[in-house]
Amino acid sequence: KDFALPMILCNLSLEIEQLIDKQLIDQTIETCLHEVMEVFYQKDLGLIVENVSAEDNSLVDSFEGRSVNPGHSLEAMWFIMDLGKRLGRPELIDKAVKIALSTIEYGWDKQYGGIFYFMDRLGRPQQQLEWDQKLWWVHIESAITMIKGYQLTGNKECLAWFQKLHDYMWTHFKDPKYPEWFGYLNRRGEVLLPLKG
């Protein structure tokens, strides 16, 4: 079972709630909140995994079953914060901030800076060859999460991480000649492809 669907439905449900039956939206929100925050979030790891067993929601010891995508997890947490605000559930916002801080600490490259694209929850080799690349969208979504976490809770760790992300992004992704960003960096933060994001 894949994290992508319940994760994106957390956001999509708020975007289209004016167009769809309220009962369906409310049911979808509750189902997706449960999936994201109770099934894919692994409390003992402090992380969200990308895949669990479709049979019993357990962890699977395979490439897919060990995969952690820090950017995906961090993006989901600002969706959860929006839902927490919409539903009047501050405890949901607090939990999202806690997960976000745990995830960014885990996903931050301690040697070169930036957030890894993919990681293995057991520290084993990755199937994805691009696992150590630094992608623009991962950093943008993470920055949104951190500034939103600070705005909603006043948590100073979120503000510090936002500043760290801001500095990294404007130092590494920005094209020095034109007001655009490169989309893909290597692990060291050097432009990997001249494509713009």
PLM segments and residue spans:
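Glycan-recognition and catalytic cores of secretory/periplasmic carbohydrate-active enzymes
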Residues: 1-197
